[in-house]
């Protein structure tokens, strides 16, 4: 097993085919692939990863200053804090400055997309679209298990594919971020109302949970 050293993980930037962001090629001693990252808007940062490791690889770091929503599109391995395996097509949440550690298995493509957003930006956007929408994103991002929300998963994967199409416009990417936040807000509002009214979990969530357990 090899542990990633941040000072040599990326060896060079790749010529960027779109107008913003940076593509980084990874060091061949770790594997093949790249990572694209961009502060598309000053309130959120997007990272798209497509890497195939040569051997068992450990990655340890701390999450940045914002809340992070991640979608594993493909990949295999184990995350710590808490311990759980990495499953394709599942979402994960990370809080600001949270400790992150994972071991990725070799020769299985690690494809994922993360969106880091600022709490103030989320609050401001929610106020604009619905002044009375009471949702608590900070509690949502305390969720430490992997989960599946159909609309959010689809929007995140669509954004990943759009970014890798090399035709992604900044305006469209921003619109997709707002779409993802709106889906999350709707989900949180629906579940808050269900709790207040004593309603059971909805059929969509039951199906999602069933898919995770099989």
Could you describe each region identified by the protein language model?
Residues 1, 96-105, 119-122, 176-178, ...:
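Hydrophobic transmembrane alpha-helix bundles
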Residues 1-22, 26:
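Short Lys/Arg-enriched alpha/beta "domain-start" segment
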Residues 2, 10, 45, 65, ...:
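Alpha-helical structural motif
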Residues 5-14, 122-126, 137, 159-163:
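Generic structural signal of hydrophobic/aromatic residues within well-ordered alpha-helices
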Residues 23-135:
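N-terminal regulatory/effector-sensing and dimerization cores
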Residues 122-123, 130-139, 145-158:
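A short mid-domain helix/strand-loop element embedded in enzyme catalytic domains
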Residues 148-164, 174-188, 193-214:
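A short, Lys/Arg-enriched amphipathic alpha-helix from helix-turn-helix/homeodomain DNA-binding modules
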Residues 168-170:
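Solvent-exposed loop/turn segments connecting transmembrane beta-strands
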